[in-house]
């Protein structure tokens, strides 16, 4: 997990879901509403190839099932395919048995389509934490996962008291890497500079300084993005103003913020980072 600044790898992650995948909103889906994720992922793949970056794609099982060409394209481009669950349901709304079923259903789909069994998981809307869903980590381990990236250490979502850097969760002789997304400490608490919100609302220099500081400390910065965040002209759900703000933000193209970061810093997949940490 540690290394010199010149050799530090950071991680770029994509939560592969449609524009209508917003937790708690029903009535939208394939067959009745247009898909935008294929074209947006294609654009991401082209961009990553142009700057020689490898990423982790956390794919919803329902999306992979509906669009069977998506995961093979991601895998063929050399990226890691990981699990985002099946139905985009909050983990807090699932029983342990239902959570296990979602994992297995998604793993079966992704394994067939990518040729590899996923080793990483990210919960929808950061809905997994050590305090509210402690049972989920053991299930992830038992289902063959080596890492989770769900505990966003923010004051308003995720794991509020969680670490800002990767760590191992121990469970009676078992262990699982927890890899939180990047945040920036402030007097107001941790700020969400590592992804969609960060690209929308914080200045590029602030984000760059956070990456630089982490790398100087021997830590990897983890970024996250949704395909809809590079599609400013795409459709949006008719949500309240607050939920519009949270789910979509202003109509901006996050790639305009991300490309300079990819050119300045080194990026790889989370799976590659875990391999590096465990072989160190």
Segments (PLM) and residue ranges:
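Catalytic alpha-helical scaffold of carbohydrate-active enzymes acting on polysaccharides/glycoconjugates
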Residues: 2-187, 203-280
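Surface-exposed cleft-lining segments at the edges of enzyme active sites
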Residues: 31, 191-201
């Amino acid at each position: 997990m540690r290394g010199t600044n010149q050799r530090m790898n950071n991680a770029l992650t994509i939560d592969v879901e449609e524009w209508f995948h917003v937790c708690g909103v029903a009535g939208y889906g394939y067959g009745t509403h247009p898909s935008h994720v294929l074209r947006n992922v294609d654009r991401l793949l082209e961009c990553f190839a142009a700057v020689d970056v490898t990423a982790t794609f956390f794919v919803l099982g329902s999306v992979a099932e509906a669009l069977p060409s998506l995961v093979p394209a991601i895998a063929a481009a050399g990226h890691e395919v990981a699990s985002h669950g099946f139905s985009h349901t909050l983990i807090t709304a699932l029983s342990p048995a239902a959570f296990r079923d979602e994992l297995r259903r998604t793993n079966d789909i992704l394994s067939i389509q990518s040729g590899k069994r996923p080793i990483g998981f990210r919960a929808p809307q950061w809905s997994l934490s050590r305090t509210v869903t402690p049972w989920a980590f053991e299930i992830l381990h038992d289902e063959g996962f080596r890492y989770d990236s769900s505990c966003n250490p923010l004051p308003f979502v995720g794991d509020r008291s969680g670490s800002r850097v990767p760590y191992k969760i121990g469970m009676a002789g078992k262990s699982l890497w927890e890899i939180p997304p990047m945040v920036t400490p402030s007097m107001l608490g941790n700020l969400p500079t590592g992804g969609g919100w960060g690209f929308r609302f914080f200045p590029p220099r602030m984000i760059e300084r956070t990456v630089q500081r982490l790398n100087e400390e021997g830590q990897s910065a983890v970024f996250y993005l949704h395909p809809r965040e590079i599609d400013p002209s795409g459709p949006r759900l008719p949500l309240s103003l607050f939920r519009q703000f949270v789910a979509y933000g202003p109509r901006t193209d996050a790639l305009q913020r991300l490309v300079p970061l990819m050119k300045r810093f080194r990026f790889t997949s989370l799976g590659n980072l875990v391999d590096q940490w465990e072989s160190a």
